[in-house]
């Protein structure tokens, strides 16, 4: 089956977790690679 849109590369699924994300707008890379740092916890409700 041919792709009618032509110049498409092989389809790469863009689901969450399939590709490493660079940090910038999306902080996924920072959260995964903490290198010994504690995660920053933002408290939204008093507990």
Curated annotation (Swiss-Prot):
An annotated GO cellular component: endospore-forming forespore
Subcellular location, record wording: Spore core
Biased composition (Polar residues): 29-47
Keyword flag Amino-acid biosynthesis: no
Induction section of the entry: Expressed only in the forespore compartment of sporulating cells.
Disulfide bridge positions per record: none
Keywords noted in UniProt: Sporulation
Pfam families: SspN
Coiled-coil boundaries: none
Ranges for region Disordered: 1-47
GO biological process: asexual sporulation; sporulation resulting in formation of a cellular spore
Composition skew (Basic residues), residue ranges: 1-12
Family: Belongs to the SspN family.
NCBIfam families the UniProt entry points to: PRK09398.1
Protein's name according to its UniProt entry: Small, acid-soluble spore protein N
